[in-house]
Amino acid sequence: MLKFIRGKGQQPSADRHRLQKDLFAYRKTAQHGFPHKPSALAYDPVLKLMAIGTQTGALKVFGQPGVELYGQHTLLNNSASELNVQLLEWVYGTGRILSLTAANQLILWEPVGATLLPIKTLPFDGKLKKVSSLCCSLSKDLLWIGTEGGNIYQLDLHTFTIKEPVIYHDVVLEQVPPAYKLNPGAIESIRQLPNSPSKLLVAYNRGLCVLWDFESASVQRAYIAPGHGQSVGLTVNFEGSEFTWYHADGSYATWSIDNPEPPSNVNYVPYGPDPCKSINRLYKGKRRSNDVIVFSGGMPRSAYGDHNCVSVHASDGHKVCLDFTSKVIDFFVTFENNRDVAEVLVVLLEEELCAYDLTDPNICAIKAPYLHSVHASAVTCNYLASEVVQSVYESILRAGDEQDIDYSNISWPITGGTLPDNLEESVEEDATKLYEILLTGHEDGSVKFWDCTGVLLKPIYNFKTSSIFGSESDFRDDAAADMSAEQVDEGEPPFRKSGLFDPYSDDPRLAVKKIAFCPKTGQLIVGGTAGQIVIADFIDLPEKVSLKYISMNLVSDRDGFVWKGHDQLNVRSNLLDGEAIPTTERGVNISGVLQVLPPASITCMALEASWGLVSGGTAHGLVLFDFKNFVPVFHRCTLNPNDLTGAGEQLSRRKSFKKSLRESFRKLRKGRSTRTNQSNQVPTTLEARPVERQIEARCADDGLGSMVRCLLFAKTYVTNVNITSPTLWSATNASTVSVFLLHLPPAQTAATAVPSASGNAPPHMPRRISAQLAKEIQLKHRAPVVGISIFDQAGSPVDQLNAGENGSPPHRVLIASEEQFKVFSLPQLKPINKYKLTANEGARIRRIHFGSFSCRISPETLQSMHGCSPTKSTRSHGDGEADPNISGSLAVSRGDVYNETALICLTNMGDIMVLSVPELKRQLNAAAVRREDINGVSSLCFTNSGEALYMMSSSELQRIALATSRVVQPTGVVPVEPLENEESVLEENDAENNKETYACDEVVNTYEIKNPSGISICTRPAEENVGRNSVQQVNGVNISNSPNQANETISSSIGDITVDSVRDHLNMTTTTLCSINTEETIGRLSVLSTQTNKASTTVNMSEIPNINISNLEDLESKRNTTETSTSSVVIKSIITNISHEKTNGDNKIGTPKTAPEESQF
């Protein structure tokens, strides 16, 4: 009853609402990793840009590091297979690109900022019009489209319409030698001669190639390949004097343009004489004075038909066959300054992108700056280390440089696009810069370090734990084997193992399950599937120590426990010898291995490097280990005494006879009470109006209740309200939270050391750390605990504070189970607040983290909030003195910067919530991950600055920003060359409609205002409600569901302006779009909106004077008449202005402009 009397409590003020908008904003920013299921590749040698299309309809353009553009195709007939990008063709030098989808639809894309927008679309119907090849003219005005029917169509890129003449295959057949009597088949390749722009070289499917002359509209020369069957394609040299023609039987030959006779080596099969597979792509260039042929495929069909290879053959006899572990999608070769000198080979594979130096006869690999294969080995866990200090970051870089010594030093050839000038940072900022490092654990036992501070996801180090496990006979140097050329017999292709993708693991027990990393010291702890915990660091010690090994048994012979799972991993015996060489892994010192028995998977870990302690949990209990002295501290078994089986299968539970009998009596009593007359019953208040879902208490004997879910080291108030003590907190699946008090001996220093009288120092005795159980909490609902965090009065987590800092008292502990949050006071453990997520939202908590949020606001707003007692969650970490009664305070040194720490949580539905602490009031709720994406939900991890990363596919990472102060997104742009004749078309339209255009401009200028938030408003107030109620979509995406509405405003207009169009233009000229990535891309429109205007006219005949108008005489009998007219107009896709809202202290984004063009439907 009290909650009804109190009502809803104190509501946040208007200032708080404004502050929430300034602090919290959800948006998808950048994408990292390798595109999922790539299907097409294209390279622009003029602007030096690379484009990749995927089977899911994604289109990505890459230039120099930092220049990334995203686009997304949309569904036509609700079939996902139609999104498959089959061909890509650049309009060279303009920045535009053409894509052909499986729906046989041709789309022209144009970059606007960091987004690719589809500006023109052309569908092809009919089987004979199935597009098989594309070729853009050197003059950038035409596109030649080859079809499977054997015809070539010309597409005018300005109007995006088919124009005459069409090169029909029957016309070509009439002009070829009579010896060729076959149907030529589909168009496989079209090439324009660089020295004769009026001539086309066309390769048909069935061994016919013709040189077509547009001036005479005839076949100038025909080339017939005898006995080769199907042709695949051709490539023309830079001089236009010869071309290389390759075929489906694995052969190729170089023909002269001026000589239709076949060359002498027309039957050359590089991997013959056995039948070979098709050559899918071929390039020809030069290395010094030698010719170099690069081709994919062509392997002997019977012996090596399953190999995925790209071969590099030089005329001096040097041959290399790059053997990859995934399918070759396509490749291209970059050349030096429009010459035949080959520089870099870029290969797009199904699972990775590889590049090689063609100027070096050894064909060394090149380390690409982006598109790295995150899933080279399957990713098994993620860990994001925030605020890594500069010294640790440099240590990791030094270790990584030792692994990169075998890569080529040639510069990356794809350097297109431009970056803003403000990206350059000063040396002073770099000295104090903090880094974000993503650590990914893999199935093969490796841990990869990725620098994710900026837009680029850069691999900086690869730590392998597999080198310390196994027998000596199994061990080999994998790194040397990967980079060496493994030559086979003389008659076979010279294979070389290439690429990093390796989906197979020698031993599944090596898989990494948990990672702990200290951002201030560089201490690394890796937990594996077989209970192994590897301890390593990046500290360069003068004295190296050999590898140590120790095991800790959690169950021993407890109740006859039998482990039915896999065996533990064996450490290599030669590493454990007393005189063994210290174990290092390319710059990292591996100090020891802790084996937890039974060898179950590590479920959670905690690290406190300053104390020298690490704790690990399994399904059977937890261990505490002193890794500095390499001695165990204690272990605790969490198994229920009734557990009689091992964890190799689900833990079985026995129900006691007493409990079974009690439940039987309860069911009996319940059955009697429900046999009364139900028709006379009146529903109670609780039955009539359920307030929330009930959180049912779970049985204590639920399976896997002994699993330790989370561990936490913290120095807080446990036994005394005045003194902090080091503690270890653990929680299980059965909602049991245990608090262990740690006794750390004082560190011995040189000042406290007392020398002996004899002068001989006694042997150093290692410090002993002890632990004892101090308190235990049992949550009633018994839901698994997913996280524990202790924070001070300002809401800052004590485990994120610097060494020696305890935070401002009092401390509070947040315990997050799968169903609810609960806040307790310390040391009394008195409940303060709780938030029932499952009862209110129907979701379960998967992950929690504390993030810091900041924004710039006016000092007046800060002063008003300070005087009005803001919520306790508001706080500032400035240098000003804080009021002990009010958490929110003013920063004296930076009065316009406001800071706040909040709780971030992820649910199993893929939603991310931001809650204030300790009030647990919701500040933001965003649908971040699709609820069906289980891998994405389980892989998501947060940073301390309000960002998140998750696996959007097996190879890609999606970046999310929750804070307005920290947004990492691509800022590079691609210059766009305007289409020719655009200006002349506009001038003609302006000249024809000068009066109407002038009137339109006058009225638009009257009603166009700039609101304080920076959004351009061009609609009249009387019609704002119409635009607000209309539901607008962008490629099937409902704009109203966007989290960032009104961040972008797109103003559109029509090319041909008439009086009616001016009237419709005044009704609604502004369409507001959302900020979206991947599936949601800004402004991908084919139709902006369909507007319907209704005009109502009422005629009262009595008020009309007696004027001799014949048209009105017919209305005399009707007296009062009301007439309603309806008119509709479709505004076609053209974007003239995109203005981004300047909010939350972000830099103002430039306004890209494009010229108006109508789309063809």
UniProtKB/Swiss-Prot annotation:
InterPro entries: Lethal2_giant (IPR000664), LLGL2 (IPR013577), WD40/YVTN_repeat-like_dom_sf (IPR015943), WD40_repeat_dom_sf (IPR036322). Signal peptide: none annotated. This is Lethal(2) giant larvae protein. It is found in: Cytoplasm, Cell cortex; Cytoplasm. Belongs to the WD repeat L(2)GL family. It comes from Drosophila melanogaster. PANTHER family: LETHAL 2 GIANT LARVAE PROTEIN (PTHR10241), LETHAL(2) GIANT LARVAE PROTEIN (PTHR10241:SF29). Its main location: cytoplasm. One of its GO terms (cellular component) is cortical cytoskeleton. Changing residue 656 to A: In 3A; loss of phosphorylation. In the presence of aPKC remains localized to the cell cortex and does not display any decrease in phospholipid binding.
